[in-house]
Amino acid sequence: MSETTGAALCRSGKEENMLQLLSGSQRTVDALGFLLAFALTALMDSVFREKLPQDHGRAFAVNGELSKGKARGSGLIFVLCIALVTLAVVPLRTEYIIYTVLLIASMLSGYFDDASEVAWNEYKKGFIDLVIAIVAGVTYLNFNSTAVHFLNWSFAIPYPLYLVLIVVLIWASINVVNCTDGVDGLSASLAVVSIGTFLLAYGKELGDYATAAI
């Protein structure tokens, strides 16, 4: 690390990411990260889409046979893109790095299941998801308190109960995605909400980057 960068970190009194040091604005970094993730995902998807495993059809999904032959495992592309951008735009703290690794681990679990000639056993997939959820819960509680703040109220939840709630939330969320035909059933609405929120919160910054080459 250069003396200038080190001095900047010392003056700020807090951890900063590389892009924030270059731009000086967290809002600019957030807007840039959003655009980078979108552009990188679109580019990588167009390049590697044909190399993804093919859907074999789904026996219990509505119109599952119509999915036969479609590309599967696209999470390998967009999760890795998101992970790279995340490491570039968030402070390099151990907590955030662990979350990123767990995100990739969860994605790889689904990808290898998609790529397998024989679908994995439900108990195997559920156990992997459970381990990921437990590690995520322990990581969060190791770096954060068990206090919950709501408006003017604040109260603490016992560690064991808080851990159970985190594990249930993460484990259930992973399996809700599995029950909605992969990410297809959730991505559209989440993308619309996320994009709309970014446009409202960072309209000026996004506009500046979008028109920078004009």
Spans of model-derived segments:
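Short, strongly hydrophobic alpha-helical membrane anchors
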Residues: 3-6, 10-28
